[in-house]
Amino acid sequence: MTSIGIDLGTTYSCVGVWLNDRVEIIANDQGNRTTPSYVAFNDTERLIGDAAKNQVAMNPINTVFDAKRLIGRKFSDSVVQSDMKHWPFKVITNKNDDKPLIQVDFKGETKTFSPEEISSMVLSKMKETAESYLGKPVNNAVITVPAYFNDGQRQATKDAGTISKLNVQRIINEPSAAAIAYGLDKKGSKSGEIKVLIFDLGGGTFDVSLLSIDDGVFEVLATAGDTHLGGEDFDNRLVNHFVDEFKRKHKKDIMGNQRALRRLRTACERAKRTLSSSSQASVEIDSLYDGIDFYTSITRARFEELCSDLFNNCIEPVEKVLKDCKLDKKSIDEIVLVGGSTRIPKVQQLIQNLFNGKELNKSINPDEAVAYGAAVQAAILSGDKSSRISELIFIDVAPLSLGIETVGGVMTNIVPRNTIIPCKKTQTFSTHTDNQSGVLIQVYEGERTMTKDNNLLGKFELTGIPPAPRGTPQIEVSFDVDSNGILNVTAEDKTTKKVEKITITNDKGRLSLKDITKMVEDAEKFKEQDQQQKERIESKNNLENYIFSVKNSINDQKIISKLSKSDKNIIESETESTLKWLESNQSAEKDEFNQKISDLESIVNPILSKFYQGNNNPKPTTTTFNQDLD
């Protein structure tokens, strides 16, 4: 039973598989080992990955990215509202449950998709990439999420996997996966326990995890982070800087022009990467807006100044995990960098300064480490007996405190943050007033004292409590956190033995089973449409290839001398006629293209066969150029 590991990233995704006693990171159909987390819609087809990102400047409002910044969040969330200012695509609210929906034009119709559906399309692409490489279907996967993802975001990611027809064996934390990659790489090189800090700064999220690694046992001691900090935020600072510069130089504001903004953002992303290895980067965009060319440059020092507060925000979570573990900086044996944004020199400098100049560990590929670790975990969960991984033990923690609201709106923690998971914790509560017949259990996650400042996960009632003075009934509340970090809560009246429970996936914004079932059906329908479109284009290309193959044949000197003028005229007339039809009917159906090939072959083949029967030359065929098909 093959299982794959998928790093579902904000900007790029990556897939790996355990094969022949090692992890293989699988290249996509473009030969790239990471795939843009982009989905595009147009009048004829849906594009995913490189194909979607490559056309974004031409079709910005129907090209969706950053689904990870929407998944599991409410439309009214201030983070979502802020992000919407930077996105060219339209995000609307589902009025019933404050859930964000992405609106696009697809095949002439207005369609809406949930963030889970967009993420499922990216997951499907990664699944297909693995299946193409392995040559067999893949149904099982381990998917990674930021360590600081809350319960709703984890469940929504699991739902995305379900929509893409994957059995999600486990949701694991990204820095934990990276630690597996590091630990496996170093297995046997160091004896005894080592303390490793994983610093994971990606395209959209930031995590820090502190682990103890000892002879194949990986124990997460503490984790912290920011689910909304990464390379995209640095890009935003550059975009705003150059928008202001363009306005200052040319007295024109490009903020309202999505195509110009997208071209500028692509140039900013390129400049940011250049600044990791050079002290200055050029930005050159022809005819950016109103026919005006925009040629400018930026220094690394200016970039660092623009992003200084964001870079400094990376340090606080590091200090937090050290404090949570009651460890000083000298106790850390290795600082491992993960995520593309850790290539930024200023980020490396700040970490190094914090640890008094300690050398940073750059031994693992920052773009692939998370998928690598996920692939190892997938192999373990699938029962792989390889001696390299069979004895690995992984112990993770709950990233946020979990508790209930008690009198006065106070947060009473039942599972403190950094508790080892899976776990079950129980506390006993009682009634607040005499003869109280029911209690409302409101479940929250977060670190603030008052529940109003934390995140409500769900609520339920336990009723039928027998009349008794306040403080008499014994109500036992149990929190059960599974290996995915997803929570189940049970409340039991010890007198009546009455039990009520809630799986904290019934959160208001979460997809219902009915929603998921429909989305699975839609995904299958889109997959069929994608296949039909692929076959249609192949038939169109086959027809075009055949026409030019025939034209080349009748211009071959060996053939011209053997063909009568009338035969040559017939072939020329038919090929020209078919070519004109093709140019005017680019959107024709597969069967129409195939029929045109048959019609042309029925005229051309009898004529050319006279020549080919006596020669060894190959006849023109519809498959001459199939290797060039996309």
From Swiss-Prot:
Segments for region (Disordered): 611-630
Keywords of the record: ATP-binding, Chaperone, Nucleotide-binding
Record's GO cellular component terms: cytoplasm; lipid droplet
Gene3D superfamilies: 1.20.1270.10, 3.30.30.30, 3.30.420.40, Actin, Chain A, domain 4, Substrate Binding Domain Of DNAk, Chain A, domain 1
Pfam (any one): HSP70
Annotated GO biological process: chaperone cofactor-dependent protein refolding; protein refolding
Signal peptide boundaries: none
NCBIfam families: PRK00290.1
Family to which the UniProt record says this protein belongs: Belongs to the heat shock protein 70 family.
Function: May function in protein folding and assembly, and disassembly of protein complexes.
PANTHER family for this protein: HEAT SHOCK PROTEIN 70KDA
Record-given protein name: Heat shock cognate 70 kDa protein 3
Organism: Dictyostelium discoideum
